[in-house]
Design a protein with these regions (language model features):
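Conserved, well-structured interaction surfaces
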Residues: 1-38, 188, 205, 209, ...
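Active-site-proximal loop/short-helix segments
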Residues: 1, 47, 67
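An aromatic- and glycine-enriched ligand-binding surface/loop that stacks and positions planar moieties
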Residues: 13, 38-42, 50-224
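Well-ordered alpha-helical scaffold segments within catalytic/enzyme domains
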Residues: 22-30, 47, 51-58
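Active-site-adjacent "gating/activation" loops or surface patches in catalytic cores
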Residues: 220-235
Length: 235
């Protein structure tokens, strides 16, 4: 009914997870052709894990506010809370993780193979790799289908750049965080040293070599607003 009162947030999110459960029950494990390009049981699990994680953390950190006046609630004889949602996220994630593994290849021979460039390569593969991929989109540039993306042009023409705040979230290679003092006195190139290796495979750093190129590319302010040029998805 159009005049029905709004359902409580917790009830709605409980139903979202129930829908994911129904999808998991009814969807196939894999499709006969192009399995990574169709919604499957794995996709349902991934969506449930993300939705439950978001709601669980939201309720945990907003409990007692106007958004979540009460953390623990009962709907249809089921008690929900931040803990309940987080456990649902764990259960869905564990079931999915057991079916997948991290991509570790370097089939494109991206420069920097010795330092493991698999993270950078994973996001520019011509064909989705089933090792880690849950759900992918098939692109085709022929004259009939023309399913394309233009993210490389967006990066170049609009100079999309990572913010300093975003960059500062990358931890050291040993898993520890930088102090405010360390970050304040660190040069641009020094900020990549001893850092989570995914940083240099997401943002252009020292020794960056474009795919298909042989020599390192110098940082150009024509492609970035602040020096932190994003290279993820660029092939």
């Amino acid at each position: 009914s159009l005049n029905k009162p709004r359902d409580p947030r917790g009830y709605v999110m409980m139903k979202v997870l129930e829908d994911c459960d129904k999808a998991y029950e009814r969807l196939p494990e894999a499709w006969g052709s192009g399995p990574l390009f169709h919604v499957s049981k794995n996709a349902a699990l991934a969506l449930k894990a993300r939705a439950a994680l978001f709601e669980g953390t939201f309720r945990k950190y907003h409990a007692g506010s106007e958004f979540v006046p009460q953390d623990e609630q009962v709907f249809e004889d089921k008690t929900i809370s931040s803990t309940w949602f987080l456990q649902e996220a764990v259960n869905a994630a564990e079931k999915l993780i057991g079916k997948k593994a991290l991509y570790t290849g370097n089939t494109m021979g991206i420069a920097g193979k010795a330092t493991n460039a698999s993270y950078r390569e994973y996001f520019v593969l011509e064909v989705a790799d089933p090792t880690e991929t849950i759900l992918a989109r098939a692109y085709n540039s022929d004259d009939i289908v023309q399913v394309r993306h233009g993210i490389q042009f967006d990066y170049k023409n609009h100079k999309h750049s990572a913010t300093t705040r975003f960059v500062n979230h990358y931890l050291k290679s040993d898993g520890k965080a930088y102090t405010e003092t360390e970050l304040a006195t660190m040069s641009y190139y020094d900020s990549f040293k001893g850092r989570d290796p995914r940083m240099a495979q997401t943002i252009q750093g020292p020794g960056y070599i474009g795919i298909g190129d042989k020599a390192p590319e110098q940082l150009s302010m024509e492609r970035t607003l602040n020096g932190y040029r994003v290279i993820k998805y660029i092939s």
